[in-house]
């Protein structure tokens, strides 16, 4: 009888794969503190060839931006430095799967034009086959589709472009920004710092624009017509001043009800008239 031999970690993983739901197995690997070894095991064992062929297809695809890595190595690096949220981890894993299908040669270089859109369709098709639910699949596909939107920000975005980015991100905006942060595996520390700084700037602009829009959307409890009728005054600058007083009052004390608001307006008007 051959002596018993303890399985290596990779072999143990592979044996477990045969009896585990594909989505459960992949998720188990992704949420590890460092998923790199597990992801390489999925590729090297042949598991990915059977259940996730989009992943090993990246192995020979050279990334013109990250020249020291093929796209598979880059993908695993991005996934390993993503936040430990399954939605973001899956988006990182799928974010470049469209590259082999969009490769073209222009001006002496390689491009992958619209690979995000192609990758989103591929993620939407593959994830249900792995056993993932529709909602998670939709979110991951959306993140993959939007993953390249940040490119060009440092060239100068208008406020409209910033609003569009935030609007397109919607409820996934935080996940999208985390994915963008993770998608920088450069060996040049200055490049990493520059990308994170630019994304910090974008996030601050988004917050500032949201605050501005919220302020513009604010309204006092009563409108200009009610002010004119109550104070028995003509339309003019004083109406705007009264409305600003009432808006400031609402910001400080909240909604008071029309009776109390009119009483405060009377006090303001009396003090102003003296």
Where are these regions (language model features)?
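Core structural elements
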Residues: 47-49, 148, 233
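A residue-level signal for conserved active-site and pocket-lining positions in enzyme catalytic cores
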Residues: 38, 42, 78, 144, ...
